[in-house]
A protein has these predicted regions:
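C-terminal motif of bacterial Sec signal peptides marking the signal peptidase cleavage site
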Residues: 40-43
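Generic short beta-strand segments
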Residues: 82, 151-155, 189
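Surface-exposed short loop/turn segments
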Residues: 45-66, 70, 124, 129-179, ...
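Short secondary-structure boundary motifs at beta->alpha junctions and helix caps
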Residues: 101-111, 178-219
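A structural "domain/chain start" motif
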Residues: 45-114, 224-231
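Sec-exported extracytoplasmic/periplasmic mature domains
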Residues: 123, 127-131, 218-226
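Sec-dependent N-terminal signal peptides
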Residues: 32-37
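Bacterial N-terminal signal peptides that target proteins for export
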Residues: 3-31
Length: 231
């Protein structure tokens, strides 16, 4: 009886060891399979050699200027959250090697989704220019005079021709809040050359493109709102 009890105890102690051994074997097998799939590589990269994923901030490079008086300074602009196609509605940095083809950078991304970030930068820009009494999100629960809706149409690094360029397109629509009518619509597009075929060069070009885009959008919004609204 004592021998049987000892055998049962020994088996119970061996069970966790076997489980750990099996997990190690599975991990080794997964690494071997991963190496086997990478036939185009010069060797197999260990998990320790995989570079960390880097995140970049999309920024407005324009220097803040003095607020400028405007006829529409007493009005309130409400801004809807930007919409985007599912492929661009992500923090992944997108590139394209050929027309109609898109892919994600493996080790590079944005700190915020580009559509959301562009909306934030545009609101800051309009606030700084003093174009409106207030610029707020439609979710703020306040009344406004105009509602701005935007959609991110394109936002990618085109690497089809070295060193490539970035493509940014945004469509915008201004609505008269009281009359519930569309006042104006426009599509903005910027293509800026990149200095290299890598994520860092793409981000620098994206910042320049976004800055120019914000220049155009701000001027357009102010110009449209300055016109009398026909109801």
């Amino acid at each position: 009886m004592k021998n049987a009890a000892a055998a049962v105890t020994a088996l119970a102690l061996l069970a966790p060891i076997r489980a750990i051994h099996e997990r190690i074997c599975v991990r080794k097998l997964a690494l071997v399979l991963l190496c086997g799939l990478g036939t185009g590589l010069a060797g197999c990269m260990s998990f320790q050699d995989i570079p960390p994923r880097e995140y970049y901030v999309l920024d407005d490079l324009a220097k803040a200027g003095a607020p400028r008086p405007a006829a529409q300074a007493g009005r309130v602009l409400l801004v809807n959250p930007a919409s985007a196609s599912p492929f661009y509605d992500t923090q992944n940095l997108v590139f394209s090697r050929s027309p109609g083809q898109r892919a994600y950078y493996q080790f590079a991304g944005w700190t915020e989704r580009p559509g959301r970030r562009l909306t934030e930068l545009l609101m800051r820009r309009l606030e700084a220019r003093g174009s409106f009494k207030s610029v707020a999100a439609t979710t703020a629960g306040i009344k406004g005079d105009f509602v701005l809706s935007t959609r991110l149409e394109e936002f990618y690094h085109d690497t089809g021709a070295n060193p490539g360029s970035v493509r940014v397109e945004v469509s915008a629509e201004l609505v008269d809040y009281a009359g519930r009518t569309i006042v104006a619509q426009r599509r903005f597009a910027q293509s800026v050359p990149a200095t290299g075929e890598n994520a860092q060069a793409a981000v620098a070009a994206f910042n320049r493109a976004a800055t120019t885009l914000l220049d155009e959008m701000s001027a357009w919004i102010e110009g449209v709102v300055a016109q009398p609204v026909v109801r």
